[in-house]
Amino acid sequence: MSKTLQSRKSLSGKLRRAANTRIVVEGNLALSIANDLLSALDVEPFNSEEDCISRSPKFGISPDQFRNSYLRAEIMSKYDSFSLGINTEAVAWEKFLAAEAECAKTNLRLYRPNYNEDFNFSLGETCIHMARRKIVKLLGDSVPFEAVLRHCRFSGGATTTNSRLYGHPSFKFALAQECTPRAVPYVQALKACTNMDLGITKVSPFNKAVTVPKNSKTDRCIAIEPGWNMFFQLGIGGVIREKLHLWNIDLNDQTINQVRAYSGSCSNELATVDLSSASDTISLALVELLLPPAWFKVLTDLRSRRGMLPDGRIITYEKISSMGNGFTFELESLIFAALARSLCELLNLQPSSVTVYGDDIILPSDACSSLIEVFSYVGFRTNEKKTFFDGPFRESCGKHYFMGVDVTPFYIRHRIVSPSDLILVLNQMYRWATIDGVWDPRVYPVYTKYRRLLPDILRRNVVPDGYGDGALVGSVLTSPFAENRGWVRRVPMIIDKKKDRVRDERGSYLYELWSLQQLECDSEFPFNGSLVVGTNDGVCTYRHRERVSTAISDSVGAYDIVWIPCSSRVLAPYGDFRRHEGSILK
């Protein structure tokens, strides 16, 4: 073994041991970091845990003052470990059932419109009629099932059959999934056209409504769908996503809304609109009024009509779908865009000036008040705290601007118990404090104070920004651990340690086949692939592919070290971590 490799293995061992230590301090470390940072910025620190989640920023001040005030309002707002004495699950269910009650009222109002004596349409009714014509023109009268099938897939989450631990698509192909009664014909048609041995465990008339953590004030309600329903829902969502490109709406790109939020903060000509409980307030009646009959039938065939609550109660949904449904995001984007574009046309504004990303909506400021009126009529509630149409502040898709200045805050979401947790917070602080390329001198002492809590070897290991948060961000030229080999520079990073878990061989091959048809069959469907799994070694007969791995890696709650190639230049803040080929040194 070469000296270089021996040295690297020795260093990896030291870094690994340091990464798996615990950070032990008195009190709440996350709150201490936030308060020290606010004090350094000459902003009032938090007086209590309740104070962390109940403040609003101050307007009418300079961009720098607003940026600091806004950081105070946001930094701990998503922290999930405060002990506030709030039953977060009960709060979530109360909100969920309230949204259902609102949808019931909306259904009654839209199915039985109350026209006046002169039979004049309200603004909301007029927008519904215009939006329907726009949607029919965009989607077409019939559903393109071949296109839908190309987008169908299993997600990586839980289903009513598979827990999250077995959420990988290969497990879902291996284990027959449930579906609702009206979705059975779709599964049968899929089985007939693909030659794949697909099965249904049972026909389930409902999904499972559950809660997941959100913050210290409330949980979030989602629905776990039957597996086959989710499979086809994602197909419908994929087609709608493609169709929206005709309106210059790209649901794969958040930067469109982010750039327009910047523009709105400079010119005041664009408004950013956000909705409360958007996915839980899309009523059945609204979808039936807006979508062509064929599309509405498919959506209702593939949705879960009823849901089971944790206490065993069965409810009949008044909404079309909820978070957890595979087409909710695309459907809500379509509806919001259609209504906003129709309103702009009525007001003689450019419909093309509307962009949406889920419930993040941007349109001309002159149309914002009218849009709020239209949304109220069709059952949507505008989030007043996150809707801006007049003034210097705009926020959309995670970017926040004040008079054209980037004031995007960072968030401390969880307890800090490991070096990896602290590195994440310190890197967020670094990016926030160096947004203009140099350190804010007020913040640097706070950064160095808490950096000392890290083991010495982790304090010295730095990587350029853009490669994730597996090490402190900084200039790689100052790292004593970077290896230079010709044109390649390698640096060590902390990653979650994973352990291989064997998955079903047949499910692995079925998943591989399905993935291949999605990549290679742009226009030809059905895909009549074949699969042969022998009793001894199992070989996929599709083309000349290598044998498929039948193992899947799961985190084991510890950390490991990987060496990755990187550039010596510092990338822009918030860069994406692109995983390079690197070997994990055992």
UniProtKB/Swiss-Prot annotation:
Spell out the PROSITE patterns in the cross-references.
Answer: RDRP_PHAGE (PS50522)
List keywords of the entry alphabetically.
Answer: Magnesium, Metal-binding, Nucleotide-binding, Nucleotidyltransferase, RNA-binding, RNA-directed RNA polymerase, Transferase, Viral RNA replication
E.C. number, please? 2.7.7.48
Domain of life, per UniProt, equals Viruses
Cofactor(s) demanded: Mg(2+)
Show the disulfide pairing.
none
Q: What InterPro entries has UniProt attached to this entry?
A: DNA/RNA_pol_sf, RNA-dir_Rpol_cat_phage, RNArep_beta
| Catalytic reaction equation(s) | RNA(n) + a ribonucleoside 5'-triphosphate = RNA(n+1) + diphosphate
Q: Kindly indicate whether the keyword Metal-binding belongs to this entry.
A: yes
Where is the RdRp catalytic domain positioned along the sequence? Answer: 259-391
Residues recorded as binding Mg(2+) 2, renumbered to this chain, are 274, 359-360
Molecular function GO labels: metal ion binding; nucleotide binding; RNA binding; RNA-directed RNA polymerase activity
Q: Which GO terms describe its biological process?
A: viral RNA genome replication
Describe the protein's quaternary organization and the partners it interacts with.
Answer: Homodimer; the replicase complex can dimerize. Part of the viral RNA-dependent RNA polymerase complex, the other subunits are the host ribosomal protein S1, EF-Tu and EF-Ts. S1 is needed for the initiation of genomic RNA (+)-strand replication.
Q: What is this protein called?
A: RNA-directed RNA polymerase subunit beta
Protein's organism: Qbeta virus (strain MX1)
